[in-house]
Curated annotation (Swiss-Prot):
This is Renin. Its main location: secreted. Residues 80-397 form the Peptidase A1 domain. The active site is at D98, D286. Interaction with ATP6AP2 results in a 5-fold increased efficiency in angiotensinogen processing. Kidney. GO terms for cellular component: extracellular space; membrane. It comes from Ovis aries (Sheep). Keywords: Aspartyl protease, Disulfide bond, Glycoprotein, Hydrolase, Membrane, Protease, Secreted, Signal, Zymogen. One of its GO terms (molecular function) is aspartic-type endopeptidase activity. It catalyses: Cleavage of Leu-|-Xaa bond in angiotensinogen to generate angiotensin I.
Length: 400
């Protein structure tokens, strides 16, 4: 072998032990905001009644009969957003980066005046962009809390300093709930092409096609600092995982359903007893969701083990004095137990020091999409998460 070939081979082997070249990463800084649920509580809304209404709506949407993919997130509890630019010059939007979906959409200046939720958000104006290209194809995306409708357009989209030509949705019908009180404008799906409504190529796939990233991965960090929880957010890293955000090594789990960030779980245990999912079940790792959710019957069993009281199918509470004595909950993924303590799954309400809400919700999604569990920000805050498109796997490491 020529000397240069030997040196190249040795260099290639050595890169496995070198620290990540963090300078090559593209970063999207995230901000944490009060969730829609928190805003509704502050306004005295009966969350039990609202939960019942949305449960009924979920049933009437007939998810299993839809030809379009169903997004599992209802955004009631979403707390993290980042900023992107659309158009020339860029129009700035606050978006949720959601691994549970694959489309990008923002409200449009063409939004009907009947939808007052549009009025409080930034609106995309195609007339103000010199790079706009008309498409016009109508689309509908169904969520756990309703649906958004609009039409497709094409323009330049800038994410983490990378600009791509992107087909996206201009939303003209935006539901009052939850979007009237949402602090974000739209959603940027980080899912797979198979999940995209209208056959649209997702933003991340366009970024991968440019070959500007070191690795075909992105990773998500959510801050766990509770002292100034609404002032801190997190970061999405495109092209790798930043060692400053995690400790120990990554443990990887292969995706179980092609074209989805879904993996197989082999049990949910309290203390040392496996209560649920002992024979295996499906779980989606969803950056657009804030809490952990599962089938309502399973959640009720889990809540009984914790001694929690059910306010509605999507909200459970405990006496705040119980928090130090509540047991750990472990989720078994890829042969490893990922454990949350009560400090991880109990939410302390600044307006109520008597009843504390648990970051665990019931959610029934019928076949073929469900039944499925969802691991949201409650889980990701504890375990820094890497989404690996090249190897079709998800990695978890203990967050710093």
């Amino acid at each position: 072998m020529p000397l240069w070939g030997l040196l190249l081979a040795l260099w290639g082997c050595s890169t496995f032990s070198l620290p990540a070249d963090t300078a090559a990463f593209r970063r999207i800084f995230l901000k944490k905001m009060p969730s829609v649920r928190e805003s509704l509580k502050e306004r005295g809304v009966d969350m039990a009644q609202l939960g019942a209404e949305w449960s009924q709506l979920t049933k009437t949407l007939s998810f299993g009969n839809r030809t379009s993919p169903v997004v599992l997130t209802n955004y009631l509890d979403t707390q993290y957003y980042g900023e992107i630019g659309i158009g020339t010059p860029p129009q700035t939007f606050k978006v949720i980066f959601d691994t549970g979906s694959a489309n990008l959409w923002v409200p449009s200046t063409k939004c009907s005046p009947l939808y007052t939720a549009c009025e409080i958000h930034s609106l995309y104006d195609s007339l103000e962009s010199s790079s706009y290209v008309e498409n016009g194809t109508e689309f509908t995306i169904y969520y756990g809390s309703g649906k958004v409708k609009g039409f497709l357009s094409q323009d330049l989209v800038t994410v983490g300093g990378i600009t791509v030509t992107q087909t996206f949705g201009e939303v003209t019908e935006l539901p009052l709930r939850p979007f009237m009180l949402a602090k974000f404008d739209g959603v940027l799906g980080m899912g797979f092409p198979a999940q995209a409504v209208g056959g649209v190529t997702p933003v991340f796939d366009h970024i991968l096609a440019q070959r500007v990233l070191t690795e075909d991965v992105f990773s998500v960090y959510y801050s766990r600092d509770s002292k100034n929880s609404h002032l801190l957010g997190g970061e999405i890293v495109l092209g790798g995982s930043d060692p400053q955000y995690y400790q120990e090594n990554f443990h990887y789990v292969s995706i179980s359903k092609p074209g989805s960030w879904q993996i197989r779980m082999k049990g949910v245990s309290v203390r040392s007893t496996t209560l649920l999912c002992e024979e295996g079940c499906m779980v989606v790792v969803d950056t657009g969701a804030s809490y952990i959710s599962g089938p309502t019957s399973s959640l009720r069993l889990l809540m009984e083990a914790l001694g929690a009281k059910e306010l509605s199918i999507d909200e459970y509470v405990v006496n705040c004095n119980q928090m130090p004595t509540l047991p750990d909950i472990s989720f078994h993924l890829g042969g490893k137990a990922y454990t949350l303590t009560s400090a991880d799954y109990v939410l302390q309400d600044p307006y109520n020091n008597i009843s504390c809400t648990l970051a665990l919700h019931g959610m029934d999604i019928p076949p073929p999409t469900g039944p499925v569990w969802v691991l949201g920000a409650t889980f990701i805050r504890k375990f820094y998460t890497e989404f690996d498109r090249r190897n079709n796997r998800i990695g978890f490491a203990l967050a710093r």
